[in-house]
C-alpha cells in the first residue's frame, strides 16, 4: 500500500479508532459515536490522483417518499458550507457527508488527517437531528436547517 494509506492507518490507530481495512482497495471502514448519534465512516485514498476522501454515512436510508424533502434539506445545508458537502443517492436513499483533500505534492500529515476527519464527523453529527427531524418528525427542511444553524 502507499505512503498515503499508511499515514491514514497510522492516524486512526494512534487516535484509537477501530477500523476494518478493505482488502481490494485503499479503504478503511470505521464507526463514530457523536453527541447526536452513531454513524459509519469511510476513509479512502485515490492513489492515482493523490486525493484523500472521508465519508460519514447517515445511519438509515431515506424512504423514497422523503427523498425530495431531504434533497431540499441537503441543498439548504450545503449552501455556504465551507468544508465538504452532503450527497443523496436518489436510487437507494443513502445520505453521506463528503470531504476531500488533494495531497499531490503535499505531505499528508497526522494534523491534516485529523482536521479533515474531525471537521467531517462534527458536521454529520451536527446535522443528524435535522435529517431525522425531516424524515420522522415532519419538520420542514427550512426549519430543520435554521434550528441547526442558529
Model regions: which residues?
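Long, contiguous binding/interaction regions
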Residues: 67, 89, 99-100, 113-126, ...
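Short, internal acidic amphipathic alpha-helical interface segments
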Residues: 57-94
Amino acid at each position: 500500500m502507499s505512503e498515503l494509506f499508511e499515514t491514514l492507518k497510522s492516524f486512526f490507530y494512534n487516535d484509537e479508532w477501530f477500523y476494518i481495512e478493505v482488502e481490494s482497495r485503499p479503504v478503511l471502514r470505521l464507526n463514530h459515536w457523536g453527541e447526536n448519534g452513531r454513524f459509519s465512516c469511510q476513509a479512502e485514498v485515490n492513489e492515482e490522483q493523490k486525493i484523500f476522501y472521508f465519508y460519514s454515512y447517515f445511519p438509515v436510508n431515506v424512504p423514497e417518499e422523503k427523498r425530495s424533502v431531504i434533497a431540499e434539506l441537503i441543498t439548504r445545508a450545503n449552501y455556504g458550507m465551507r468544508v465538504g458537502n452532503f450527497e443523496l443517492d436518489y436510487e437507494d436513499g443513502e445520505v453521506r457527508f463528503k470531504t476531500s483533500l488533494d495531497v499531490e505534492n503535499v505531505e499528508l500529515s497526522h494534523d491534516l488527517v485529523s482536521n479533515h476527519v474531525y471537521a467531517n464527523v462534527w458536521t454529520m453529527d451536527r446535522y443528524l437531528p435535522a435529517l431525522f427531524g425531516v424524515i420522522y418528525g415532519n419538520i420542514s427542511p427550512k426549519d430543520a436547517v435554521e434550528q441547526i444553524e442558529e
